[in-house]
Amino acid sequence: MKLKTVSTFVGAMFCVVPAFASPEITEEEAKQRHCLAEAILFEAGNQPFVGKLAVGEVIMNRVKSNKYPNSICGVVHQGPINKWWKRVHNKIVPVRNKCQFSYYCDGRSDRTNKWARTKTWQDVLNATIYLSVLHNISVTNGATHYHANYVNPAWNKYLRKTVQIQDHVFYK
């Protein structure tokens, strides 16, 4: 399916999401959605809506797989933790640059509040709702991995490329 077709389809399908979205969610569901929104923002904030959706879909595909943690936050935060911080300060701090999702352990502040009134944040929230409610439509053909198109990670030779959406290349 071509990207333009996917974008049109996703746009049309998204129009129905608010009708299906539950106004009441549990605290745990809210936490998981926040992890998803944060990951989409920091991994794909500069991408078009379909690119944000694709990154979120990779996370959701990992949650469904038995090869990864079974929660959104578990998938997003997967990686080794700094044992010194855990032992001395009783804090879970990721080892820098060793995470599955680079924003989580790049040493930069990951505050979402400065994005609160932007179109980017609204797109992220829309993608999060879409993925939480209508998660049976794929724009990545089942991808569980992706990378920016300006890098060439060693792991990509072991996977099959499914699609490229703007600056991200997706694999399964």
Where are these predicted regions, by residue range?
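Gram-negative bacterial Sec-dependent N-terminal signal peptides
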Residues: 9-14
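N-terminal signal peptide c-region/cleavage motif recognized by signal peptidases
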Residues: 16-18
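Bacterial extracytoplasmic/cell-wall-associated proteins, especially those involved in peptidoglycan
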Residues: 20-172
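Bacterial N-terminal signal peptides that target proteins for export
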Residues: 1-7
